[in-house]
Amino acid sequence: MAAMISFNDVSKCYPGGFEALKGITLSIDQGELILFSGHSGAGKSTLLKLIAAIERPTSGSIIVGQQNIGTLRRSAIPYLRRNIGMIFQEQKILYDRNVFANVMLPLQVTGFDTRTSASRVRAALDKVGLLDKERADPITLSGGEKQRLCIARAVVHRPSLLIADEPTANLDSNYARDIMAVFESFNQVGVTVLISTHDRMLLDSTRHRIIELKQGKLVA
C-alpha cells in the first residue's frame, strides 16, 4: 500500500540562506499518529507547513494523497486542505464571536448549509468536550479549553489528516495529557495525526512513533 505522505530528499531554504530542512526522506501511512520532536528551530513546524502546502520545498518531492506539493497549482491548494485539519501556533481565536461561531467559521467559508453546519459544529464540540460551552465567550475559557476550541475548528470539516504544531505549549501537564487524549480519540477512528512537540512528558509517555529532527535533519 502506498504511503499517505512521502518526503523524498526534501530540503527547504529560506531567503537569506537559512536551511530549515536538509535532505528529509520519510513515509507516513494512513492512520498513523506521529510525534515530531526536536529543539526549537529543528524544522518541525516547517515540515508540517510543507505537508499543508503553506510552504513549498526548495528541492526534493513531497507527495500528499497522491498530489505533488512542489508542483501543485495554487488554485488546487484549497482542495488539498479540505482533507487537512490544521492547528498552528499563529492561528487566532476570534474573541468577538462565541465558541460555536468560532467553530462554524470554516464551514461558512466553504459554503456548507446552515443545518448541516450546526450539526457538524455540535459534533466537533462534543468530541472535544466543549458542547456545554457552545455559547460561551472564548475569553472565559481556560488555556486547555481554548486549545480544544482550536482542535474543534480544525476537525469540523472532518479531515482525514490532522496536523498540530506545539499544541500543548504553555499548558500544564494535566491539560497536556487531556489534549493528547483528544488527538488519540481522533486517531482511533482512522484520522492520521501529526504533532510537533518538545513536551518531554508527552514524548516519554507515548506509545506512538516518534520522529526526531535536529538542525533540519532526521536523527537516525
Where are these regions (language model features)?
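ABC ATPase NBD coupling module
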Residues: 15, 69-85, 188
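The feature captures the beta-strand-to-loop junction immediately N-terminal to the Walker
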Residues: 37-39
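Helix-to-loop junction immediately C-terminal to a conserved catalytic motif
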Residues: 52
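Conserved ABC transporter NBD signature motif
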Residues: 60-68
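Conserved ABC ATPase signature
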Residues: 137-141, 145
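A short, proline-enriched helix->beta-strand linker immediately N-terminal to the Walker B motif
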Residues: 156-160
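Catalytic Walker B motif of ABC-type/P-loop ATPase nucleotide-binding domains
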Residues: 162-165
